Amino acid sequence: MNAAGDEQPGKYLEVFMEAYSDFARVYDIFMDNVEYEKWAEYLIGSLKEYGIEDGIVLELGCGTGVMTELLAESGYDMIGVDNSEEMLGEAMEKRAESGHEILYLEQDMREFELYGTVRAIVSVCDCMNYITEEEDLLTVFKLVNNYLDPDGIFIFDMNTPYKYREILGNTTIAENREEGSFIWENEFDEETGINVYDLTLFLPREDGLYERDEEIHYQKAYEPEKIRELLEKA
């Protein structure tokens, strides 16, 4: 991929759509510290609290399908939407192993389409932060509202400006494993609210050598008040 500095703000999501290519192969390995089971327990508890014991649930930004599978295991009829063909490929491998009847759709969150409404929509692991334009985030919220049942609920998480500024900041993280190695360089611009993940991967090849690949990801920090404002507008 090209260097991050050459991209215009309106193209951040397009660059993200090109990412997760080689990283999809090892995404679950390097994300094994995420407590998906606890996340699933929280989501399921919240769904049941609002009377959603079963029915169709949509996951936006489903990635490799880890959470989608956990919700399907709990009896929900799952639809997973993601814009990465490679990530969905990993998700479909999980589906083949589990036998769950999950519908996966390769779609842009800003333009996703369904044939009808759903009981609930969920989005985890800061997927909404990848929507870097305010008007695009409003569009996503409007689509969510359009495809939810009248008594449906929308559950999502987003990274806050505090996390980007104080926790991630301008840091570098490196990890080496048998399955591959990565260098994660993080840079947060407080003025624009844009956070850049520059990810360098070293993945083993069959000939014993390593292949180097670089992926650049952009996220946007939104103030909680702005998120509430956009939700109310939707």
Give each language-model segment a name.
Residues 12-61:
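Conserved class I S-adenosyl-L-methionine
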Residues 58, 66-111:
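Class I SAM-dependent methyltransferase SAM/SAH-binding core
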Residues 113-120:
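A short acidic, Gly/Pro-enriched loop at the edge of an enzyme's catalytic core
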Residues 124-126:
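Residues lining the SAM
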Residues 129-131:
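A short His-aromatic
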Residues 138-150:
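A short glycine-rich, Lys/Arg-flanked "PGG" loop and its adjoining helix->strand segment in the class I
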Residues 155-230:
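SAM-dependent methyltransferase
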